[in-house]
Amino acid sequence: MTIMRKTHPLMKMVNHAFIDLPTPANISGWWNFGSLLGLCLVIQIASGLFLAMHYTPDTMTAFSSVTHICRDVNYGWLIRYMHANGASLFFICLYLHIGRGIYYGSYSYLETWNIGIILLFLTMATVFMGYVLPWGQMSFWGATVITNLLSAIPYIGTDLVEWIWGGFSVDKATLNRFFAFHFILPFIIAAMAMVHLLFLHETGSNNPLGIPSDCDKIPFHPYYTTKDFLGIVLLLAFFFTMVXFFPDLLGDPDNYSPANPLNTPPHIKPEWYFLFAYAILRSIPNKLGGVIALVMSILVLALLPHIQTSKQRSLMFRPISQFLFWLLVADVLILTWIGGQPVEPPFIIIGQIASLLYFTIILALMPIAGIIENKMLKW
């Protein structure tokens, strides 16, 4: 008798994706972050659904509805902090996932990589709109500053901004539409994640050596289900420690003040996961130039498959490229720090140097290093 999971139409799909999937035998813990991102998305959708039951997207009551959730709803404080810190956890996993993709050359899978970049943009849009919903000071001013960047687009910019706002400033219409988009986007992200997986399973997973692994594959279950489960346990332990003991560690104190259009905070800044891009935006004195640099800071990832010069896929045996990769990681951390600092010397010049270095490493130094390494190996 044939096993049901191999014949039933629905079970067959699950079987091919998570049970009998041929997987390289040598993939490391760095390959766990895909499943962890799936877990983060489930946490966010579940906690967000319960928050939406009590939240009101109205400028007069949004802030007090969040207060009501924290004070009056059963375990409302827990759900709210799970949702807020879940976003941070999502981006920690996301950046580690992207870093692993760059290090081991996973960007060679073009469709999977490009859908990953679309997923990153969708996640950033979702998180930005979610940050506006509590209607605190930083919510309001963050929304005003970031949406206002679109006015830099020639000719249609001003009309575009007013169209997004639904008026002449960030107001009730803006909050309402942001809530609607924030609610629907995670489901679009979930659908895109399925497409991401679909394309990944067309080619099979990459591995640390960056070489074809068709000759040495093992079934996903039980080997990698067990490995993923360990990752999930460690992630949840870290997550709940954070939620229960340090819930406001990554938040902004300004967001505990209700939004006031008449009072500008001394330093407007986004959440920590956008600070590197915000620092790149601020490092260019021209508004349109800054917006282009901001978009390119993410979009530059799409160029990676086209500017790879090395004949080796992974960085595992490429010491010069390894050095440049870790220099890039350090540079992104410096940009993150600079993004949270006021616009004054010496932070301005540090931000400009770090921004220039960011694009130089990706677009020039890494391709040059690949050519040098090929020459060293007489390839």
From Swiss-Prot:
UniProt xrefs under Pfam families: Cytochrom_B_C, Cytochrome_B
GO molecular function list: metal ion binding; ubiquinol-cytochrome-c reductase activity
Classification via Gene3D superfamilies: Cytochrome Bc1 Complex, Chain C
Residues that bind heme b b566: H97, H196
GO CC, one annotated term: respiratory chain complex III
Residues at which heme b b562 binds: H83, H182
Entry keyword set: Electron transport, Heme, Iron, Membrane, Metal-binding, Mitochondrion, Mitochondrion inner membrane, Respiratory chain, Transmembrane, Transmembrane helix, Transport, Ubiquinone
Cofactor comment: Binds 2 heme b groups non-covalently.
Mitochondrion keyword on record: yes
One biological process term in Gene Ontology: mitochondrial electron transport, ubiquinol to cytochrome c
Membrane topology per record: Multi-pass membrane protein
Residues that coordinate or bind a ubiquinone: H201
Recorded superkingdom: Eukaryota
Required cofactor(s): heme b
Transmembrane parts of this sequence: 33-53, 77-98, 113-133, 178-198, 226-246, 288-308, 320-340, 347-367
The keyword Mitochondrion is assigned to this record: yes
Compartments in which it is found: Mitochondrion inner membrane
Family in the record: Belongs to the cytochrome b family.
Miscellaneous section: Heme 1 (or BL or b562) is low-potential and absorbs at about 562 nm, and heme 2 (or BH or b566) is high-potential and absorbs at about 566 nm.
Annotated function: Component of the ubiquinol-cytochrome c reductase complex (complex III or cytochrome b-c1 complex) that is part of the mitochondrial respiratory chain. The b-c1 complex mediates electron transfer from ubiquinol to cytochrome c. Contributes to the generation of a proton gradient across the mitochondrial membrane that is then used for ATP synthesis.
Annotated PANTHER family: CYTOCHROME B (PTHR19271:SF16)
Oligomer status and interactors: The cytochrome bc1 complex contains 11 subunits: 3 respiratory subunits (MT-CYB, CYC1 and UQCRFS1), 2 core proteins (UQCRC1 and UQCRC2) and 6 low-molecular weight proteins (UQCRH/QCR6, UQCRB/QCR7, UQCRQ/QCR8, UQCR10/QCR9, UQCR11/QCR10 and a cleavage product of UQCRFS1). This cytochrome bc1 complex then forms a dimer.
Record-given protein name: Cytochrome b
Organism in which the protein naturally occurs: Dipodomys simulans
Gene: MT-CYB
